[in-house]
């Protein structure tokens, strides 16, 4: 089986769910929907459905073309909806792009050659509500180059549960510890580090498989 992910996240999801079909995903930072996608394999081969989010305009256009069966948003997921934030696009390396005020410090050199655009924000709660997402999300992937903690804070964990969460940390503190503490306090348990990602599962998610 061919992985489309950067470090095999899609294969790990399928292993975790024993090649489950018809699951539901949310991918924040979806790029063009195929290159380094954590959810394309799930949709293509296992009939998963879900939400893809990508604020960069030309990537969003490709995303809509490549993932017509997904619900696609061109917003920046954040801790408030309907705000305008400055979004840094790293020229020639747009996979390293992110919200200017949160982009990881070690990416500053990359973004010395950058383009800035204004992007409208949406919280996870509003994103899920507008998409009529189920209360149980099988897989949540967040790769936003620095704003991951703000995104997770915008989830109402009493309304939505994620069976498996992959969140990029890039070894940046205190962000990584803040993410860990937030998820642990809401019923999740750390299961593995996958290079620059941490993976968590919901404690009782076996009941949902």
Residue ranges and their predicted role:
Residues 1-209:
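Phosphate/nucleotide-binding beta-alpha loop and adjacent structural elements of enzyme active sites
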């Amino acid at each position: 089986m061919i992985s489309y992910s950067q470090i095999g996240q899609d294969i790990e999801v399928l292993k975790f769910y024993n090649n489950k079909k018809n699951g539901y995903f949310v991918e924040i930072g979806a790029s063009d929907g195929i290159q380094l996608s954590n959810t394309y394999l799930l949709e293509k081969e296992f009939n998963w459905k879900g939400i893809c989010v990508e604020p960069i305009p030309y990537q969003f256009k490709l995303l809509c073309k490549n993932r017509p069966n997904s619900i696609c948003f061109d917003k920046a997921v954040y801790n408030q909806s309907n705000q305008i934030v400055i979004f840094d696009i790293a020229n020639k390396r747009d996979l390293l792009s992110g919200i200017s005020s949160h982009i990881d410090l070690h990416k500053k050199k990359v973004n010395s050659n950058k383009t800035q655009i204004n992007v409208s924000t949406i919280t996870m709660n509003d994103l899920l509500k507008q998409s009529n997402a189920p209360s149980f999300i099988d897989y949540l992937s967040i790769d936003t180059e620095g704003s991951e903690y703000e995104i997770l804070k915008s989830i109402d964990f009493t309304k939505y549960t994620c069976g498996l969460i992959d969140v990029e940390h890039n070894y940046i503190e205190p962000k990584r510890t803040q993410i860990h503490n937030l998820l642990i306090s809401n019923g999740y348990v750390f299961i593995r580090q996958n290079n620059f990602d941490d993976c968590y599962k919901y404690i009782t998610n076996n009941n949902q498989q």
